Amino acid sequence: MNRMWEKKFWISCFFIILFFILVTLQVMVELGRFEKRETKSFTVIDIKEQKKPLLKHIKEKSNSRLRHLKDNYPIMLWWSPLTGENGRLGQCGTDTCFFTINRTYLQDPMTKAILFYGTDFNMTSLPLPREISHEWALFHEESPKNNYKLFHEPAITLFNHTATFSRHSHLPLTSQYLEGLQALRSKEYLISIQKKNFLRKRLAPLAYVQSDCDPPSDRDSYVQELMKYIAVDSYGECLHNRDLPQQVNNPSSMDDSQFHHILAQYKFILAFENAVCEDYITEKLWRPLKLGAVPVYFGAPNVENWLPSNKSAIIVGRFSHPKELATYIKKLDKNDKLYMQFIEWKLHGNINNKHLLSTITERKWGVQDVTQDNYIDAFECMICKRVWENVRLKDRVSTTKLWNAESLHLNCPAPEAFSFLPGHLLKSSMREMWKPSFEQSKKEAKALRTLVDRNRNFTTVEFWNLVFKFQ
C-alpha cells in the first residue's frame, strides 16, 4: 500500500515538474520574441536615422552634378515617366542632350523639348503655359484603343515630332514587332506539308490565340461566325475551346519556343489585329510568317505593302463573308500544291517586297538587338538632333526650322462591328462601347485643343464642361 502511494506521489511530482518546465520555456520564448521585436525595431530606426544625412548628401551631390552636366546641353524632358531616368547625358552622333523625367526642369532655360508617351497622356496634367521654345514630341506605338483622343487632328497636331506606327510619322514604328529579315527567312520552326497533313488528324486547320476579347476590330464576332463553317482551335480566353500545355498557358509564354512549336503545327493561323488602322501591324502577322504557317489576316487595310511576298498571307477583306473564306481555306487544306504557293517564299527565303526590305535595312533602331539602339533611343535622338539643328541654324541665319505633326501621323477610322445573321453575334458591353467611345473622343480632342491654345492650366471640370458643350 505504501509502495503504491509512493509511486503515485512520484508520478504526480514528475507531471508537476514537467508542467513548470513547459511554462518556463513558453515564457522564455515569448520574452525572446519581445526582445527580438524591440531590437529589430530599434535597429531599423537607428539605421534609418544614421542614413538620413548620408542619403541627403548623396542626393544633393547627385542633383548638383546633374544640374552641372545639363548646363551646356539642351534638356529633353520626358513628361511621362517612361524611361524612369532622373538624368542622363545621351550621345546622338555628334550631338549631346540631357534626358530626364524630373519635372522641376520645366522652367529651366535649357529645356527645349517635352516628350510624351501616348498611353500615359493626361490632358489635365500638361506643361502649361507652353513656352515658345518648348517643342512637344509624341511617342505612341500602341493601339488606338489606349488613347483615342490622340487620333484626331485637333490633338495630334499639338505635337511637333512624332514616333507612331504610321509610316507617315517622323519616326515610323510600323516594323516594331519584326526583329529583322532573318527572322522571316528562318526555317527553325518550319514543318513539312506531309507532317502537317498527318497532324491534321488531331488538329483543326486553323488556330486562334486571343485573350484580349471584344476589341475595337470586333475580331471575335468574325471568328465566331467563321467557326460555323470550318474548325478552329482557339487557345486563348476568347472563344476558348482548346487548352495549351500548363507550362505555356500564360501571356509571358507567347514568345516561348515551346509555344511556337505548337503553333507551327498548324497550316493556317488567324492573325486578327485589335484595331483596324493603316500600318498598325503587330506580332499577329509576323508570328505565323516566322513559324512557316499561313496568316489569315485582318487589320491594316494596306497590309499588302508589308508582306514578304504577294502570296504569303490570306487577306480576310477579300472575302464577302466568313463562309466564303472558310470555303477557300478548305480548298487550300485539301490541295497541297495550292497551299504550298503560300509557303514558297519561305522555302527559298525569297522576300521580294522592296518596301519591306528597305524599311528593315534602313531603320535606325533594332528589335531585341543589343548591337543597336531601341526605338525609344532613336526617338530621343531624333528630337535631340533636330533641336541642335535649330541651334546651329539660329547661330548662322537667325531663323529656325519648324516641325509639325500632321493628321496622317496617327489616324484611324471609326471602329465598325460586324453584322451577320441576328442572334449569332457576341453580346458584350465592351463590343458596344467602342464606336460611341470613338465619337466621344472627337469632342475630347476638340476640347483639348481649345484649352491648350488658351495656353494656361485647366481643371478636369473645365475640360469636361467644354466637352459637353460640343455635344
Swiss-Prot record:
Q: Which SUPFAM superfamilies match?
A: UDP-Glycosyltransferase/glycogen phosphorylase (SSF53756)
Per the record, the pathway is: Protein modification; protein glycosylation
Q: How does it sit in the membrane?
A: Single-pass type II membrane protein
* Protein's cellular compartments: Endoplasmic reticulum membrane
Tell me the Gene3D superfamilies matching this sequence: Glycosyl transferase family 10, C-terminal domain (3.40.50.11660)
Keyword Membrane listed: yes
Its function?
A: Protein O-fucosyltransferase that specifically catalyzes O-fucosylation of serine or threonine residues in EMI domains of target proteins. Attaches fucose through an O-glycosidic linkage. O-fucosylation of EMI domain-containing proteins may be required for facilitating protein folding and secretion.
Its protein name is GDP-fucose protein O-fucosyltransferase 3
